[in-house]
Structures are given as C-alpha cells and as structure tokens.
Amino acid sequence: MSSMTRKLSIVTTLYRSMDTIDEFIQRALAAGEAVSDDIEIVIVDDGSPDASANIVRNWVERDARISLLRLSRNFGHHKAMLVGLEHAQGDLIFLIDSDLEEPPELLSEMAQVLRGKAVDCLYGLQERRKGSRMERISGHLFYWLFSALSEVGIPQNVSTMRLMTRRYVSALLKFRDKNPVFVPLSILVGYPQASFPFIKASTSDTTYSLGRRIALTALAITTFSAKPLILMLCFSLMMAFLGIVYGGFVVVRALIGPVQDGWASLMAVVVFFFSLNAVFTGLMGLYVKQILEEVKDRPRSIIQDIYSKRNSSET
C-alpha cells in the first residue's frame, strides 16, 4: 500500500487551546494531505474551560474528516491522548499537541524517516528544552530521578509527539493502567523505535505547574519501579545493623564506667528516625494508592459527547 493511500489519523487534545486550535487544524489538514489522500483528525476535549470545543464543532460541521470527543471532565493529558488513540482508525497515527509548539509540518519528514528506518514508532526528541529556568531544572530532575529509580529507560527531552504504525498503537492500547504515564508506557510496548530531533517552539505558558510536575514524577516512579521500596529495605537493614552495634557499645560503656547524660544528641537521633519513618510510610502509601486505583477498576475516562458530521450523540 503506497504512502498516499494509507489512512492517516492525526490525534490531538484540547485544554485551553482557543488561541491555537483554529490554526492547528488548518496546518494539520495541509500536513496530512501531503502524506495521504485519506486522513482524519481526532480531537479530544479534556474538559477545557474555554471555547476551544466550540471552534472545533464549527470545523466538524464543515469537514467530515474531523471528529471531536468531549470528555465529561478534565481527566488529564495522558488519559486524553489514549482516548484519541483508541478512536483513531488510521494505518498511521500521528500524535501531536494542538498548541503549535510542535509544528504539524514535521509530519511529512517524519513519514519519510519512519519508512526509511523501518520502525513502528518515531518519537520527537527536543534538541534543547524550552521554558523558564525552573521548567528546565524540573525537567532535568524528572529524567534524572526516573532513570535512577526506574527499570524503564526513557530518552531525555522526549516529546509525546510521534508517528506510529497501527500495530504499535494496538499494542500500546493493551496497557490498561488506570493512571497512565504515556512516555514510559510507549517504551514498554517495544517494537522498533527511533528518535526524531526537532526544536520545540515556545508559544505559550505551560499548563504543567510545579505541583503537577512533582505529582507526575511521583506517579511515574511508583508506577514503573519498585526500587524505592528496595532502597528503603536496604537502608532500614543498615540502620538496624548500626543500631545493634551502637547498642552493644552503650552496654559495654555502662559496664565499664559511668555514663554521661546525652539527651540532646539522643533527641536529635529520635527525631531524625521518626522523620525518616514518616517519609517511608508516605512512600509506601503512594504504592498502596496505586494498587487501590488499579483494583477498583474504574473507567480511565468518560466520553460525554462525540461530534462528527455523521454522528452527534451523548454517551
């Protein structure tokens, strides 16, 4: 099947995208038409509080190639992306954000590279990280922590933008994590993958606050690694050994001669270990929370409305 006859799906999400979505659709359509004569654009509204969805609905009325999936609330970027992939019907699927920081025009070159390298996933890799100093520092810290504590290695400055084959996406969707972290999951899929270096523009402020970045880091580590638990066990065993040694030393000192008071140092040690115990308990609580979310088996997201020129329904 030639590249111009293979069905192409372009998948994106909406969240406060009112300023960019109209231009994005225009550019995405043009980019898609250069790659395939059979395209669709699947847009997922992740509970956006602005008028982004209304703009897309106007496009749906004019172009049958565009469909809009409205989630019942904000479920999060990673879940919204997976909803879009679940509804994409193409032989090739191009996942990209709608904020125009990743140019849709990269699609044509990525399609050529995908065919040339014979891979199933070609993921974007930022040549240099955009954003403020704090964003860059927090980004580097995330990759450092994740690489140090996880069994899943992810490239630094990897983007969610990627061009994928149908079999790759079908395999990715077999993962049913209730709190998915997209990039590590995409690595776990396997299949031949390659990077596509690009420069990400900085057109708007990030919607990922520091708090959301910290939460995502904690979720990624506790979802994909048991190393923190192993480190806790090793540290506890080491402290227990040192405690036994120190206890023996105290007993010997007491038998040999008088013991001087040392309440200040004793309290410092007690407070330190109580604090350490609180940290360990909190970390274990995160793991228990992840287990609880999985066993409850709640839906990962809920689609409220599906809009297309052929279908307009509420679910």
Show where each model-derived region lies.
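Conserved catalytic core of Hanks-type protein kinase domains
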Residues: 59, 87, 113, 148, ...
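Residue-level recognition of specific faces of alpha-helices
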Residues: 10, 41, 65, 77, ...
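Residues in soluble alpha-helical coiled-coils and helical-bundle/repeat scaffolds
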Residues: 16-19, 101, 105, 173, ...
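Acceptor/aglycone-binding surface of glycosyltransferases and processive sugar-polymer synthases
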Residues: 69-73, 77-87, 104-180, 201-211, ...
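Residues that scaffold the ATP/ADP-binding catalytic core of kinase and kinase-like folds
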Residues: 55, 171-172, 196
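Structured catalytic core of nucleotide-sugar glycosyltransferases
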Residues: 1-132
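Hydrophobic helical membrane-anchoring modules
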Residues: 2-5, 181-315
